[in-house]
Amino acid sequence: MALPDFTMRQLLEAGVHFGHQSHRWNPKMAPFIFGTRNNIHIVDLAQTVPMLHHALQAVSDTVAKGGRILFVGTKRQAQDGVADAAKRCAQYFVNSRWLGGTLTNWKTISASIKRLRHLDDVLAGGEANSYTKKERLTLQRERDKLDRSLGGIKDMGGLPDLIFVIDTNKEDIAIQEAQRLNIPVAAIVDTNSDPKGITYVVPGNDDAGRAISLYCDLIARAAIDGISRAQGDSGIDIGASARPLAEELPAASSSGFQGLAGPRGTADDLKKLPGVSGAIEKKFNDLGIFHFWQLAELDHDTAHTIGEEVGLPSRADAWVAKAKALTAEAE
C-alpha cells in the first residue's frame, strides 16, 4: 500500500479550481488564487497539488502511529461523503450539527456517548419489552437524536489526533476547539475562507459534490495506507496473516465460535480495536481470538454474542469494521 496518487487533471475534472465570486473573497487567500474568470476566483492548483499531498502524508503518518482521524463535514453535500469515507478507513466522523464542547468538554460528551450505548443495548435487548409502547418510542427518539450527533464518534475512545475539515467557515467552532487543544487541522480552504490557524491548508472548492467526494476518498485512502504501514512496522508477517487452518479450542464460546488454541505466528495487537484495553484483549485471547481476521469474519449476531462475553456488546460492530480494514490491508 502507498500514499494515494492523484493528478491535476482529476482536480480540474472535479472542479477543485473553482472558488467563490470575487467580491466574496477573503484577502488572506490571495497567495493561493491564480486569477479571475467571469467574476469567479480560480484557485492555483499548482499550489493545491503539493499542499494536498502534504495533508495526505500527515493523515497517513498519524494513523501509522496509532492516531485517530476525525472527519468533520456537516454541510448537506458533505454529509454522506464524510461518513462513508470515515467508515471505510475505520476512523470517526461528525456529519450532523457540531455540538459545542465536542473536543474541549470531552468528559460531558463521553457521558452522552455512554447514554447512547445504554439506549442501544436497551432497545436491542429484551429489556425494551418492559416499557410501554409510548416509552419505547420516547427512548427511540432520544437514541436517534444522540446518534445523529455522536454516532460517528461513539467508538473513538478519546480525543482525535488530527481532524479533517470540509468548509472552515461552517466548521469554525470545531476548528477553534482543535486549536485550543493543539490538535492539528487539515482543511479544504476556499477563496472566501481564512487559512490562519489551519495546520495543513488545502486550497480548493469546498462546495462542489465531486470535489468533496475526491477529497474524502483521498483522505480515506491515506488513512488506510497508515494502517498498512502500522502493521508493517509492528513486524506482522503479511504472509502469515492470511487465514490459517482453524485449530479448535477444547471448548467453544457460547456463541458457537471456534477459536484457536494459540496465535498463528505473531498475535495481532487487539488493543488497536476501539475501546479494547489490555484486560479486554486477554478476554479475547481466552476465547481463542488472537488475530484481526478472526473478528473480520464474524457475522452480526456472533460478534454481539462475543461482545457480551467480553463485556462490551455495544462495540461489536465497530470491532468487526476495524478488523476488516486491518485485514484487508494485510492481504
From Swiss-Prot:
Biological process terms in GO annotation: translation
Superkingdom of the organism of origin: Bacteria
GO molecular function list: structural constituent of ribosome
Pfam families the UniProt entry points to: Ribosomal_S2
InterPro entries, A to Z: Ribosomal_uS2, Ribosomal_uS2_bac/mit/plastid, Ribosomal_uS2_CS, Ribosomal_uS2_flav_dom_sf
Keyword vocabulary terms for this entry: Ribonucleoprotein, Ribosomal protein
A Gene Ontology term for the protein's cellular component: cytosolic small ribosomal subunit
Alphabetical list of PROSITE patterns matching this protein: RIBOSOMAL_S2_1, RIBOSOMAL_S2_2
HAMAP family: Ribosomal_uS2_B
NCBIfam families attached to this UniProt entry: PRK12311.1, rpsB_bact
Family: Belongs to the universal ribosomal protein uS2 family.
Listed name of the protein: Small ribosomal subunit protein uS2
